[in-house]
Amino acid sequence: MSNKKQSNRLTEQHKLSQGVIGIFGDYAKAHDLAVGEVSKLVKKALSNEYPQLSFRYRDSIKKTEINEALKKIDPDLGGTLFVSNSSIKPDGGIVEVKDDYGEWRVVLVAEAKHQGKDIINIRNGLLVGKRGDQDLMAAGNAIERSHKNISEIANFMLSESHFPYVLFLEGSNFLTENISITRPDGRVVNLEYNSGILNRLDRLTAANYGMPINSNLCINKFVNHKDKSIMLQAASIYTQGDGREWDSKIMFEIMFDISTTSLRVLGRDLFEQLTSK
C-alpha cells in the first residue's frame, strides 16, 4: 500500500525534550552519523535522562550468551554450537540497562541497511544491465541477511516481553511511494513502489508479521488461537519511502522512543533504582 503520509509523519511522531535533543549537539550536526554512533548517543541520552540507572553499549553478542539465555527457559534449548567464538554484530550495536538484580537487559538493537542505487544512477545518467541499456537494476537479496540477526536477538530475548529491534531501510528497493527522477539529459524516469523489479520490502515484513512499518512495535504482542497463546516478537521496520538517506536526528528520536518503551516494559525490574534517593 502506498503511504506517503507514513514518511511525513515520522518527524511529527517523535517529539523529544530539548534536553534529550541537546545530546545530539554540534557533534551530530557536523557529522554524517552511522547508526552505531547514533546508538551511542542514545545511550548517553538515556544516562542523562535516567541518572539512577546504568547503561552500556556493546557491538556484539556471543552465540554462547544466546544459548545460555535459551537454556534458562528450557534445558532442551541452546544446546548446539559448532564454533565456540561465533557472535552476531548488528551494525548499530546493542544498548542495555542493568536491572535491580544486577542483570543486563536489552533496551535497543539497531541496524541500518541501504539497498538499491537506482536513484543515484539515474541522476548521474548511468545505464545498467548486461548491455548497459536499462534505467533500473533488478533488486538483489542482500537485505535478507538481516533476518539472521533478528532471529538471533529474538532467541536471546525469548524470556522478555519486549523486542527493541529497529531496522532502518533506505534506497530504491524500499519505496512506499512512486517517485520521478530526472536524468542529466532531461529525461524523466518513473520508479513505481509496487514494481516487482525494485521493491524488496515484502522480503522483510516476515520479521514484523505483516504489521505496519514506520511503527514502534517494541512491546511484544500476544495473540490467542484456539487453546494457545502465542507471543510475537516483531522488529520495528522504518523506511523513508522515497529512497532517500535517513536523517540521523530522526533516527536518534526513533531509537530513543524505542529505548524508553523498553524501560517502561522493564519498569518493575528497575523500580528500586528509579525510586532510590
UniProtKB/Swiss-Prot annotation:
UniProt record similarity statement? Belongs to the EcoRI type II restriction endonuclease family.
Name the EC number(s).
3.1.21.4
Keyword list, A-Z = Endonuclease, Hydrolase, Magnesium, Metal-binding, Nuclease, Plasmid, Restriction system
> In the UniProt record, what gene is named as encoding this protein?
ecoRIR
Give me the residues that bind Mg(2+) 2, please.
Answer: D91
Q: Residues that bind Mg(2+) 1, according to the entry? A: D91, E111
UniProt name for this protein: Type II restriction enzyme EcoRI
User: Which top EC class is named for this enzyme in its record?
Assistant: hydrolase
Q: What Gene3D superfamilies does the entry give?
A: Eco RI Endonuclease, subunit A (3.40.580.10)
* Cofactor comment: Binds 2 magnesium ions per subunit.
* Organism ancestry: Bacteria, Pseudomonadati, Pseudomonadota, Gammaproteobacteria, Enterobacterales
The Gene Ontology biological process terms listed for this entry are: DNA restriction-modification system
Q: What is the effect of changing E144D?
A: Only nicks double strand DNA
